[in-house]
A protein has these predicted regions:
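Bacterial N-terminal signal peptides that target proteins for export
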Residues: 1-9
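Catalytic cores of secreted/periplasmic lytic hydrolases that degrade extracellular macromolecules
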Residues: 2, 20-179
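Bacterial N-terminal signal peptides
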Residues: 9-18
Length: 179
């Protein structure tokens, strides 16, 4: 057999195996969640200037792809706690401490909209809006720096989700599509 043909066959096999391994690493619940909420994340990006990739990654991580108790029982996809100014519905849930107060919503859309409002009105997040809207790494690191989550690896976890599921492509859709 010709050496070039053999080399081509080997390269093809390696490529097919690596693509198959990538597909197997993808969590089907994550894929379903992304498909369900990507348009809402893009809509929020257009309105509030928060990268859709960040919104989706946070929703995936904070809600366990919509399967967490907090997401299922109170439609809270972002782990947002009550805070002193919250006047809406609440639910008690164990987190860093037992029976902490979390915001509760009628539906996931309300959770997505409140997440955007929470970030845009929160003074501690103001610096994020100076970043390029497609700078998901800067946003992920900034959210951690601003104290959004207590997990020391929060930024890296968001970045990994964004890159593993190509969520950055939704940022481009939000930037380049017409309103």
């Amino acid at each position: 057999m010709d050496k070039r043909l053999l080399r081509l066959i080997v390269v093809t096999i390696v490529l097919v195996c690596s693509v198959g391994a990538q597909a197997q690493r993808r969590n089907s619940r994550y894929v379903t969640y992304i498909d369900k909420y990507k348009d809402l994340a893009i809509e929020q990006m257009k309105e509030h200037k928060i990268p859709a990739s960040i919104t989706l990654a946070q929703g995936l991580l904070e809600s366990g792809a919509g399967m967490s108790e907090l997401a299922r029982k109170s439609n809270n996809h972002f782990g947002i706690k009550c805070g002193g100014s919250w006047k809406g519905r609440t639910v008690r849930h164990d987190d860093d401490a037992r029976q902490e107060c979390f915001r509760a919503y009628k539906n996931p859309r309300d959770s997505y909209e409140d997440h955007s409002t929470f970030l845009t009105r929160g003074a501690r997040y103001a610096f994020l809006f100076k970043l390029d809207i497609t700078d998901y790494k800067g946003w992920a690191r900034g959210l951690k720096k601003a104290g959004y989550a207590t997990d020391p690896s929060y930024a890296n976890r968001l970045i990994t989700i964004i890159e593993d599921y190509d969520l950055y492509k939704y940022d481009a859709q939000g930037v380049y599509s017409k309103r």
